[in-house]
Amino acid sequence: MEKTAIKNFAIEARKILMRSAEVQAGLYGVTKNGCSNPIQKGAGFEVYQTVAGTENRIYGEDISKRRDLVDAVNEIGFAQVMEKAAYTWFNRLIAIRFMEVNDYLPTRTRVLSSATGSKTPDIVTEYREVNLNLNDEDLEKVQMCIKENKYDDAFEYLFVKQCKELKRVLPKLFKKTDDYMELLLKLSYINDGVVRMLVDTIPECNFNVQDEGQVEIIGWM
């Protein structure tokens, strides 16, 4: 078992997910300095000024998710919410990696990698055939992302859908999370980050039960 590699990954992944969550929160006017009010709002939409000074217009469910995020920050603090988000998504990434390597996923389709060795995860190339209970709106969203070459957006959307489906069969492992957690997630299989680190730097044998592989995540503090 590559304990050193696993330890280094766990430490770096935590930092990356924490920073990413903070950046995502900033897109909704939520920072360690407070939660801003919308600079504009109307029927079904709100506009927030981001940390970078740009404007972010949100609609529908994202409005209620943002409201829940603000409530959580006010209740337990900004740092604690970011830590919770990082910890939650880290655990799910590890669980899904373990399941896909051992072919334990109900869909039998890899989520973070490809059985062919391609950099593009199988869930992105085979989403039409994968049973994730995607409705027409879901399919349209994924198709639009791919059409616009926003492959990471399609990947992240499908990853979240997979987590929700796994909650049905593994409710203890994939407990229902606060919906605002989705606002704090930003994943990429194309660029360097947690997914590439997990797939490229931790040998599959460390996850494969047939090779007596078992992951011990060290340094998650």
Which ranges hold each PLM region?
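Preference for the N-terminal adenyl/adenosyl cofactor-binding alpha/beta module
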Residues: 1-221
